[in-house]
Amino acid sequence: MLSRKLFNGLLAIIAVASAIPGLVEARDIPVAKNVVLVHGLYADGSSWIDVIPYLQRAGLNVTAVQNPLTSLADDVAATRRALASQDGPTVLVGHSFAGTIISEAGNDPKVSALVYVAARAPDAGEDFGALAATFPKPAASAGVIKKDGFFWLGEEAFLRDFAGDIEPSRARALYAVQGRGADALPGTRTTNAAWRVKPTWYQVSTEDRTIDPELERFLAKRMKATTIELKSSHVSLVSHPKEIADLILLAAGHKSQ
């Protein structure tokens, strides 16, 4: 159970409208031993590299999935393999497109909580592209390059619209390791919405140029997620690793670092 001091501290950083219901639920979840981190499009598992040490110092076992990005089924299978190796309650975390992956895979009984980091959060069977089209089109979409059945983000769009608040040399390194996604991947519909049955947290990036911030707020509200907002680009896990780690620790029932 969260201490009164920690409870008050959490209230200070979480939007009041969404925080109170989420906090009530969060106090009843088991304390997690493990965290599984799932990356999204235009990235790989190394995008979590600055978040991981905070979690490890708190005593959590951390696994970062390397998604093939060849199909939703393949990505979900990679996440399920990671979950299968955990030995107890596990917080499942997804950034960006990985919100789709954790929504599909998150009904695993080991998953004690879900954390969405500037992420998609589709309902089961939902046409997420149609939902996203009801919000302003993000700038990064103009920089997508397609070739031979796969797509990635061009360098200019990556540096400006995906990782705009990252030191340029670091952003170029992230650009170099980005995964290539299969053309059909973003439009694949899920069959499950784990956020409907699992305690859920969400982080909104207010300066996001890859997913519209208002769409992120809509998703967080729809999920009744405990929500924080950061003045960040889409890659908040890189520009604000401590804040993201603290959110994950709260979902795991641990004190922030």
Which sequence ranges carry the predicted segments?
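Conserved serine/cysteine hydrolase catalytic core
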Residues: D75, R180-K242, D246
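Active-site catalytic motif of lipid deacylating hydrolases and related acyltransferases
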Residues: I29-G88, P138
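Bacterial N-terminal signal peptides that target proteins for export
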Residues: M1-L10
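Flexible "cap/lid" loop of the alpha/beta hydrolase fold
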Residues: N107-V111, V115-E155, A182-L185
